Amino acid sequence: VYNGENADKRMRGGMMHNTDGTVSYHCFNCGYTASYVPGRNISYKMRKLLGWLGVPDSEITRLSLEALKIIQTESDSSEEHFITPTFQSKELPVGARPIMECADWKALEPSGLDPDLFGAIEYLLSRGLMIDDYNFMWTPEGSYKSRLIIPFYYQGDIVGYTARKIGNGSPKYITDSQPGYVFNLDRQNYYRRYCFVVEGPVDAISIDGVAVLSNDVKDTQATLINSLQRQIVVVPDRDKAGADLLESALHYGWSVSFPDWDDDIKDVNDAVQKYGRVYTMTKIINSIETNKLKIELLAKSYFND
């Protein structure tokens, strides 16, 4: 039972297909309705219905992209046609495997738990994250041994990664990312009302949002994010890079959240570490602003010098 109190046993849910391509659904048991009209986005209610009918999230995302392509093609045929982004599969550093699979840690080193693996786990805990919050990886081989590896996925395939140095040393990050990629897009399920956009992967994992991996959103990234067809909310860091990301939000007509953090909080992950995930998410949702003028006014006092 996905909607209502009891399962319908009298087949009172009706699906209607019209010659113009319109599809509509009405359940006379619980009253749920959903529809799709060619030339419009696939609505939140229709995405929920597709999920209830067993359509995979990846297929719902593909259909949403196709609907968006139709809209853009019809709106101005003189413009360059929309092309669904594609990303090449990539290899992770040699020996990389999920930390969650390192059950027999003593087998990695004759003397016991590898100190670099222990350091990677400690780093996650210090950031308010658990080892099962994402498919974090680690390798006992080569120069990546002292790094936490965060794979980049797109439609289930690994298309890149970032490897964060544990402890001192440089470079802090080694990143293999393809142009136009949006981190954590695969985990944005159809039933969500919001998509939270941040700059970095750790912040995105902290609130299960997406990361654009820079302070400048590219058109391809915006297209992928908009294909989710829900309210897009940018949660900027409280620095110059965050101010630049906010400009992208204004450019694409997205909402912005200005949580009233304490002065020592500079980004989403800082907030999760201090307040916990539930309180952080509540503050973000309660601080969403959609009006462009109000966003510009709030921005003047939000960012640290």
Please describe what each predicted stretch is.
Residues 1-49, 139-144, 260:
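N-terminal single-stranded DNA-binding subdomain of primase/primase-helicase replication proteins
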Residues 1-6, 44-149, 153-155, 190, ...:
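TOPRIM metal-binding catalytic domain and adjacent DNA-binding surface shared by DnaG-type primases
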Residues 122, 126, 141-231, 236, ...:
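Phosphate-handling DNA/RNA-contact segment within nucleic-acid enzymes
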Residues 226-229, 266-281:
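Short, surface-exposed amphipathic charged segments that create phosphate/polyanion-binding patches used
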Residues 239-241, 263:
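Short Gly/Pro-enriched loop/turn and capping motifs at secondary-structure junctions
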Residues 243-253:
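Short, aromatic/basic amphipathic alpha-helical patches
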Residues 255-267:
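A generic structural motif
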